[in-house]
Amino acid sequence: MKKKFLAFAFIVVGTLTVGTYAQRNVTPAIDRDPLMEADAKHNLDVAWQSYSLKKAYKGVLSRFEETYAAYPEFSKIDEFLYLAGVSSYLLSENKGKQKVDLKLEKEKDKFTPAKLRENAVAYLSRLVDKYPESKYKDEARKTLALLKDEK
């Protein structure tokens, strides 16, 4: 009787263990640093304000580069890639309130129209390729099409 009870107990425990094993999270969640995430979120908010309210596209690019260099795993990096790509495109068209001064050495290397278009294609292509679920993907494709038509 004891042997049957022990065998039954092992079967029950084994069955329950297999069920919980099957339910475990197969893809581990990305461990995000809360301080870095908060800082990156702040930079994203400032970039949105610079983009939409001030039309300060150089400021958007500055915030993006700072954030991407420090924290490329940011949970909303797709949004930042979109902002950086569109800002690069608009700057290459000489739009916005911050104008590019190609007489300055610092801006000459970084903000030539060809370099800005190249960066816009890189940022937007990365968004489309790496983040297919992003809500910015369709707008990124439209801007990429505009960039390819201009070549």
PLM regions with names:
Residues 2-8, 18-151:
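Acidic, polar-rich low-complexity tracts and alpha-helical solenoid repeat scaffolds
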Residues 11-13:
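Repetitive helical segments and hydrophobic/amphipathic motifs
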